[in-house]
Amino acid sequence: KAEGFPVRAVYEYVMTLLNSNYEDWRKANPTASSDDFKFSCKKLNPAGALFDYAKLCDVSKNEIARLDAAEVYDLALEYAKEFDPDFAAALESDPEYARSILAIGRGGKKPRKDLTTWKDVRPYMAFFYDGLFTPGEFPAQFDGAVVRGILEKFLQTYDPADDAAVWFDKVKALTAEAGFCADMKAYKADPAA
């Protein structure tokens, strides 16, 4: 509980351990109740279940991604009240504002999967709250003047009406202009280029 995994995610994860066909069933039935799954003793792993933390995290990300902003708010607030009272106070100070933040990228065919546990909600939302935000440092491998230059140019091109694709294309163009690779496939093929 203190780690912040949603109860529902832990249940889903355990089901993937118990029955080898549960994960395929869930993919085919993403909104169905797990009670609809036909559990079979024949599908139990004969070697016994092995704990897989990465799998638990993946299941949890998917479970949280299925929730709407109001559900995420309620469950994150419940967690924060017990384990992070300062963050709980920030959430409660303006619930509609918090829900609107949590609604960013939620829903649709490809919902964002930034949150793995309820513990992740504070750092995810911190930059929206003056009292929680801590400015980061530029990564040491990048020249601060170059990073600042990209950010200044970004401010000149920023348009809040841009959709995600237009916004991302602008970011790629600015970074390419500064000498960075704007194509992930090309970068993976030759990171030194």
Where on the chain are the PLM-derived regions?
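Catalytic adenosine-cofactor/nucleotide-binding cores of aminoacyl-tRNA synthetases and other
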Residues: 1-152, 156
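C-terminal accessory/binding modules appended to enzymatic or scaffolding proteins
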Residues: 145-193
